[in-house]
Amino acid sequence: MSNQMNTMDITEILKYLPHRYPFLLIDRVLDYTPGESLHAIKNVSINEPFFQGHFPIQPVMPGVLILEAMAQATGLLAFKTMSNDVPPPGVLYYFAGIDNARFRRVVVPGDQIHFEVKMIKERRGIGVFYGEARVDGEVACSAEIMCARREINQ
C-alpha cells in the first residue's frame, strides 16, 4: 500500500469546479481517495467580500458559505471518483440537497477550515456524502450533502 498523497492545487481545482472569485471557496486539496474521501482547506481572510456586511464590527463567515465550500469539496470528490482525468466537457455536479446540517462554532478571519468529506453512496448519478468543516480540530459544521451529475449543453 502506498503512502503517496493525492493533492490538488488551485490550478487543478479550477479545471473541475466552474466557480470563480468570489465564489470559489476551496483553496487546496490536501489528500483524496477516489470513491472514499477528500480533505480540502479554505483560508479565511478578512479580505473576503462577505465580511463587509456579515458583520462589520464582529466578522463571522456565513454558515451557508461554509456549506457551499463543503459542497464544492464533495463535487471535487465526485469528479475524482468518476474519473481521475480532467472532467469531460459539459459535465457538472450540482448541489442537490442537504440533510442534518449543524453549526457548532463560528468561523472568523484568520481561521483555516479543513473540510473532510466522505462518500456514503452513489446511485444513478446522485451522490450522497457526509462532510465536516473543522477549525483548530473543532467541528464548526457538519452535514449530509447530495449532488447530482448532469450534462449541460454548451
From Swiss-Prot:
It is an enzyme of class 4 (lyase). GO terms for molecular function: (3R)-hydroxyacyl-[acyl-carrier-protein] dehydratase activity. Signal peptide: none annotated. The keyword Protein biosynthesis does not apply. Its main location: cytoplasm. Its EC number is 4.2.1.59. Keywords: Cytoplasm, Lipid A biosynthesis, Lipid biosynthesis, Lipid metabolism, Lyase. GO terms for biological process: fatty acid biosynthetic process; lipid A biosynthetic process. Pfam families: FabA. The active site is at H54. The keyword Transit peptide does not apply. It comes from the Bacteria. Coiled coil: none annotated. Involved in unsaturated fatty acids biosynthesis. Catalyzes the dehydration of short chain beta-hydroxyacyl-ACPs and long chain saturated and unsaturated beta-hydroxyacyl-ACPs. NCBIfam families: fabZ, PRK00006.1. Belongs to the thioester dehydratase family. FabZ subfamily. This is 3-hydroxyacyl-[acyl-carrier-protein] dehydratase FabZ. It comes from Shewanella sp. (strain W3-18-1).
